């Protein structure tokens, strides 16, 4: 794991889902530490400083797009937001930010880069 207090995070060859492959330099990003690996959920926000798509492997038809990124941390979370806070939000059509996060993170609990709605980004800003 990475210490959440680090000023810069590097993530190599991360799986992308839910438009995560569209990540670009200058994008705002929220960093969640995997609770499956002992992390605490939302830990930081930052700005994407570098993006490098992972080349596709030859001969494999279906591949999840992967990307390596560098993130410059701009703030540490001041309130907790993790699986225990989100798991009850499972009415997939209610439009709530908590439900969007629960759906995208925990239905397939693997490390990943995801795209989120503007409303969910505003919601997450409230944790800093």
Question: Which residues fall in each region the model found?
Answer:
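Histidine- and/or cysteine-centered catalytic micro-motif in compact active-site loops
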Residues: 14, 34-36, 47-51
């Amino acid at each position: 794991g990475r210490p959440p207090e680090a000023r810069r995070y590097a993530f190599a060859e991360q799986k992308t889902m839910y438009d995560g492959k569209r990540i670009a330099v200058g994008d705002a990003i929220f960093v969640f530490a995997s609770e499956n690996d002992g992390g605490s959920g939302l830990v930081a926000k930052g700005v994407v400083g570098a993006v490098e798509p992972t080349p596709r492997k030859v001969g494999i038809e279906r591949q999840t797009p992967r990307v390596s990124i560098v993130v410059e941390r701009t703030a540490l979370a001041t309130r907790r937001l993790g699986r225990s806070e989100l798991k009850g939000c499972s009415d997939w059509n209610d439009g709530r930010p908590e439900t969007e996060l629960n759906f995208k993170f925990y239905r397939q609990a693997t490390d990943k880069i995801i795209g989120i709605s503007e409303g969910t980004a505003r919601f997450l800003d409230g944790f800093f």
